[in-house]
C-alpha cells in the first residue's frame, strides 16, 4: 500500500505549453514524491519540451508498460504521432488535436486494463480536438462515453481543499432558471459527494442560492423555495449526506474558504469560477468528476501566448499531479477494504 501509484502524464496539445509543463516538473524531479509517472505522447515532443525549458533528464521510450523501470529515468510511451518540425505552435490545428485524442484514448485504455491507476494531462485544446473529429461537448463527455458512465459526471473545479460543482454549466445565464431542476441539482450534489469521497473523506457540502439574499423567502425569486430547499431536504433524508443550504452566494465562499465546507454546489458556471479564480487562480485545478479513475489537469488552457518561452507557471499542474495521486491512493485503499 505504501508504493506510489502509477500515473499517466499526458503531454497535452503540442501547440501549447503542455510539453513544457511536463518537462519542467521532470527537471525538478517533482513526480517522484507522488507517483511513478509514465509520460504519454510523442517522445520527440517531450524532448522538445525539455529543450525549451533548457535541460535534460534520463528518459527512454517504451512500447509497453512492462518495460518501465523508474530507476533508469522517465519512461515515455511513445505515440510517434507528432513531429516538432511540423507543429504550428500557438495555433489550434487538427494535427495537434488528433494527438490530443490519441493521448486520451491511450490513457483511457491503460486505465481500463489496470496498467495505470489514473492520469493527469497537460492542457488540451477543445477547438483543435473538434477539428480532428471530436463530436462530444468536451473531453469530460468523451471520457464518460469511453467509460460507459450512467452516473453523473462533470468537471469539478478545485482550489486547495475546496471543490465546486455546478447545477447548470455551459448555458446562457438567461437559461439557468429553466434548467435548475430537482434532477440537475441532485446530480450536482451527488457528484460533489462522489468526488469528495474519492479524496478519502465524507465531504461537507454547501449549496448556494441562485437569487440575491437567498431569494428573501420568495420575494426575490422562487428557486430557493420551490427547487433548491426542497431538493436538499430530500437528498439528506434519503442519503444521510452532509448537505446544507441554500446559502447566499455572496457570503458562502467566505465560510467555505475559511474551511467550513469541502464542496460548494453552485447554480451556474461563473458563480463558483469567479470566486475560486479571484482568490487563487494558480492554485486551481480541474478534476474529471464522476469518472471511475482519478483524472485531473491544470485549470488554465494551452496558453498559446506563452508557448516556447518557458515562462508558464507550474503551480496548477503540480497540484493536479498531487491530487490525482491522492485520489489514486484513496481508491486503492477503498478497494482493499
Residue ranges and their predicted role:
Residues 1-139, 183-267, 271-284, 291-296, ...:
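Contiguous, glycine/small-aliphatic-enriched amphipathic segments in soluble metabolic enzymes
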Residues 141-145, 149-151, 171-195:
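Active-site glycine-rich loop that binds ribose-phosphate moieties when present
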Amino acid at each position: 500500500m505504501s508504493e506510489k501509484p502509477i500515473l499517466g502524464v499526458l503531454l497535452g496539445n503540442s501547440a501549447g505549453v503542455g510539453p513544457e509543463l511536463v518537462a519542467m516538473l521532470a527537471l525538478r524531479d517533482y513526480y517522484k514524491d507522488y507517483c511513478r509517472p509514465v509520460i504519454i505522447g510523442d517522445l520527440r515532443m517531450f524532448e522538445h519540451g525539455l529543450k525549451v525549458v533548457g535541460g535534460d533528464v534520463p528518459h527512454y521510450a517504451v512500447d509497453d508498460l512492462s518495460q518501465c523501470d523508474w530507476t533508469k529515468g522517465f519512461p515515455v510511451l511513445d505515440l510517434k504521432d507528432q513531429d516538432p518540425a511540423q507543429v504550428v505552435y500557438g495555433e489550434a490545428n487538427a494535427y495537434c488535436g488528433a494527438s490530443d485524442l490519441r493521448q486520451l484514448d491511450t490513457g483511457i485504455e491503460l486505465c481500463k486494463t489496470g496498467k495505470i491507476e489514473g492520469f493527469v494531462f497537460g492542457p488540451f485544446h477543445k477547438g483543435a480536438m473538434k477539428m480532428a473529429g471530436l463530436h462530444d461537448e468536451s473531453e469530460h463527455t468523451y471520457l464518460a462515453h469511453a467509460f460507459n458512465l450512467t452516473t453523473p459526471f462533470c468537471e469539478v473545479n478545485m482550489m486547495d481543499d475546496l471543490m465546486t460543482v455546478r447545477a447548470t454549466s455551459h448555458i446562457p445565464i438567461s437559461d439557468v432558471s429553466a434548467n435548475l431542476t430537482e434532477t440537475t441539482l441532485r446530480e450536482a450534489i451527488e457528484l460533489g459527494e462522489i468526488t469528495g469521497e474519492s479524496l478519502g473523506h465524507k465531504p461537507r457540502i454547501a449549496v448556494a442560492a441562485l437569487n440575491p439574499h437567498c431569494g428573501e423567502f420568495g420575494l426575490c425569486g422562487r428557486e430557493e423555495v420551490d427547487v433548491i430547499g426542497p431538493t436538499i431536504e430530500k437528498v439528506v433524508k434519503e442519503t444521510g449526506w452532509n448537505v446544507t443550504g441554500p446559502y447566499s452566494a455572496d457570503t458562502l465562499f467566505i465560510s467555505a474558504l475559511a474551511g467550513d465546507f469541502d464542496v460548494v454546489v453552485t447554480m451556474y458556471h461563473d458563480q463558483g469560477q469567479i470566486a475560486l479564480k479571484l482568490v487563487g487562480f494558480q492554485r486551481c485545478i480541474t478534476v474529471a468528476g464522476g469518472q471511475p479513475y482519478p483524472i485531473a489537469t491544470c485549470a488554465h488552457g494551452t496558453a498559446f501566448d506563452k508557448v516556447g518561452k518557458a515562462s508558464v507557471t507550474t503551480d496548477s499542474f503540480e497540484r493536479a499531479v498531487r491530487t490525482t495521486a491522492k485520489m489514486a491512493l484513496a481508491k486503492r485503499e477503498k478497494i482493499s477494504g
